[in-house]
Amino acid sequence: MPEGPEIRRAADKLEAAIKGEPLTDAWFAFPQLQPYQSLLIGQRVTHIATRGKALLTHFSGGLTLYSHNQLYGVWRVVDAGEQPASNRVLRVRLQTARKAILLYSASDIEMLTAEQVAHHPFLLRVGPDVLDMTLTVEEVKARLLSAKFRHRQFSGLLLDQAFLAGLGNYLRVEILWQVGLSGKRKAAELSDSQLDALAHALLAIPRLSYHTRGQADDNKHHGALFRFKVFHRDGERCERCGGVIEKTTLSSRPFYWCPGCQH
């Protein structure tokens, strides 16, 4: 599954295609969204935000299109007027004079006012997004130490979107390797310096993955263009301590780690 950095890069591509340009056409497959088609003509997409796997497409008139790709949804960028052949079912088309963005196969799509965005059940459940560049290390450390999260094992916590949105399995194992921690540790057990290192890595590693897009590397996953230290490297030597990287299952997902230097 693509994780936060890959979803943010997808949002960047959509923004590059249509952001700031007047919409010449808007089309929705779902009847409850069709009344908005004429209303959006002439409006502009001001920005596209991400919260975990949800995209929030903000329009100049104040409305926001909420979409969650779940397992099957996918966005495409095409030239204006282009109707690409696809076995997928088209759900959304937003077009300017130059480009169009198309959403296929997704079923979780809503048009929201600002107040509805603020009270949306999914958005209330998820934590701050690791690719939100206003999120600070201090805020992440405070979440780690909160009563809700301080006694949770990292193996599960780092997959819980209520803790931080945008993390997933490859980020989970790379973050824990970076700070030398086992997936069975908890924030309540850590020293202050360990907490600082973990809070920093929880932001730095997803952002490194995001910012290093475009660098060729065969050792990648869903476009995560930075070199993995442990993910999918079981049986290889750890570059830090020379131990052998192992694979197990934690929180129902494959977990890669080095027993020699992760404690």
UniProtKB/Swiss-Prot annotation:
Gene3D superfamilies linked: 1.10.8.50, MutM-like, N-terminal
Names of the cofactor(s): Zn(2+)
Enzyme Commission numbers on file: 3.2.2.-, 4.2.99.18
Binding residue positions for DNA: Q70, R125, N169
Ribonucleoprotein as UniProt keyword: no
PROSITE patterns: FPG_CAT (PS51068), ZF_FPG_1 (PS01242), ZF_FPG_2 (PS51066)
Gene Ontology BP terms: base-excision repair
Cofactor comment text: Binds 1 zinc ion per subunit.
Official protein name in the record: Endonuclease 8
Lineage: Bacteria, Pseudomonadati, Pseudomonadota, Gammaproteobacteria, Enterobacterales
Gene name of the record: nei
